Amino acid sequence: AFQSVSISTTAGYTTSSFDQWPLFLPILLLFASFIGGCAGSTGGGLKVVRVLVLYLQGKRELNRLIHPNLVYPIKLGKRVLDERVIQSIWAFFSAYLLVFVICLLGVISCGVETFDAFNAVIACLNNLGPALGSVSSNFVDIPDSAKWVLTLAMVCGRLEIFSLLVLFTPTFWKS
């Protein structure tokens, strides 16, 4: 129970090595880290509220396939979410996925095995801590060039991707 809470909230604490576990459990926990912490927390991942809105929007689209003229607002609690909020969550999800894929391809191109690269990028982008494979305890076997890519992933995960993307827009730097 402790491990699942620690990893899904991206706290990074472990009480035992994953090497002793059946392989599907650590992989399941790593995928849970994509959900991450709650909104407003410093936890990594997509955040629970964003995943919830993505789920509700997917459910709405399935209902629209059955009933094309259905007006189906997405609500969090009793509050109806504006379509712009939903679009911004999809934009964040797309940017998150893009950063993940670019970092994964970057680490693989540095000569890291695919399984280890996948786990290293998950651990860094989600600010997770533990991972699987050769990066389960430390990153000493990872080439320095891959560590630079993983550093970028870690910064993107910690500071939120949109916060970093804003720095690269010209309007941010105008007075």
Predicted ranges, named:
Residues A1-S175:
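Membrane-proximal intracellular helices of multi-pass ion channels
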